[in-house]
Amino acid sequence: MAKFNRIHLVVMDSVGIGAAPDANNFVNAGVPDGASDTLGHISKTVGLTVPNMAKIGLGNIERPVPLKTVPQEANPSGYYTKLEEVSLGKDTMTGHWEIMGLNITEPFDTFWNGFPEEILTQIEEFSGRKVIREANKPYSGTAVIDDFGPRQMETGELIIYTSADPVLQIAAHEEVIPLEELYRICEYARSITLDRPALLGRIIARPYVGEPGNFTRTANRHDYAVSPFEPTVLDKLNEAGIDTYSVGKINDIFNGAGINHDMGHNQSNNHGVDNLVKALKDENFKHGFSFTNLVDFDALYGHRRNPHGYRDCLEEFDARIPEIIENMREDDLLMITADHGNDPTYAGTDHTREYIPLLIFGKSLSGHGHIPVGHFADISATVAENFGVDKAMIGESFLDKLV
């Protein structure tokens, strides 16, 4: 019998808690990640007031230097630790896949200087459309259409851009490049990015409408992902007939594998929490696992190196935690974690190789305190043991520590 009837995992995208032991093997603008510390530097440079996470034990997590503005709790309300990544990557897909039990020994490719000419030329030859070379770099999805949408409306050229993650995105005005044509081009791009030197996690169709100065992206986005190369704990739960709910981009990250209830994309972190609360309240969701990704920390503030905005975003999420807890049942378990770091005070604009925090709360738990430092996949091993399914490739359960 399951110790917890429902487990809810919330990933605060990019909220790292200090450089990982191998951080110097990863770089940002030529600077090794060894001094990165997302939460530590936010707390130190702009202050951080997150009383609800602090109450569970955020400030108590073992660190070389305590978080400056997050107090340590003498009597925390939950369990806490930090987890180390073993996979060879610091991107979203790698982090989430490892959390669900996989060891990624061959990282996806990212293109900080844009995609190679060979890929762009192949897409041009297939589509019969030119590619706007100036857009070929990591770009904000709204900024790229503001900057190049007017030109696309005049010329019909393709807007191809990337991000910190291993993705190729194609933006197209629906009245200039019809959806069916955009999807066909994306399917072709998917077919040529399945191996090195361009092994990409996702190809994303990004249609938009409107006039210059007033463009808006539409709901006709489509992701062409790759499925995890081995079964994850999500697959094992699904095969056992256990409910698996996804909130935000979780469904995209896993290409739908192992997910039987998708709550859809989030318009914002707050919208994501709204969707999680809907899942918590779902009368039909009696037994199973929910998996939520909140991406604003990363997309809006980490990559843009905006510590003030990042702090505000953390505080906004923290203020929603009581609502999440209020809607939990007595036999629910909440786990709050991250997938990598993205220190907004650091060099460059890329993710940072860091430990991730793990906060655990349940209304039925009488104990509290520190759990030994472990690895990302320990989360899924714990979920697997709770629901009586096999774990995936890696991970050690800490279920027996939760009393």
Swiss-Prot record:
GO terms for molecular function: magnesium ion binding; manganese ion binding; phosphopentomutase activity. Mn(2+) 2 binds at D298, H303, H351. CDD domains: PPM. It catalyses: 2-deoxy-alpha-D-ribose 1-phosphate = 2-deoxy-D-ribose 5-phosphate; alpha-D-ribose 1-phosphate = D-ribose 5-phosphate. Its main location: cytoplasm. SUPFAM superfamilies: Alkaline phosphatase-like (SSF53649), DeoB insert domain-like (SSF143856). InterPro entries: Alkaline_phosphatase_core_sf (IPR017850), DeoB (IPR010045), Metalloenzyme (IPR006124), Phosphopentomutase_DeoB_cap_sf (IPR024052). It is found in: Cytoplasm. The keyword Isomerase applies. Keywords: Cytoplasm, Isomerase, Manganese, Metal-binding. Binds 2 manganese ions. It is an enzyme of class 5 (isomerase). HAMAP family: Phosphopentomut. Isomerase that catalyzes the conversion of deoxy-ribose 1-phosphate (dRib-1-P) and ribose 1-phosphate (Rib-1-P) to deoxy-ribose 5-phosphate (dRib-5-P) and ribose 5-phosphate (Rib-5-P), respectively. This is Phosphopentomutase. It comes from Streptococcus gordonii (strain Challis / ATCC 35105 / BCRC 15272 / CH1 / DL1 / V288). The gene is deoB.
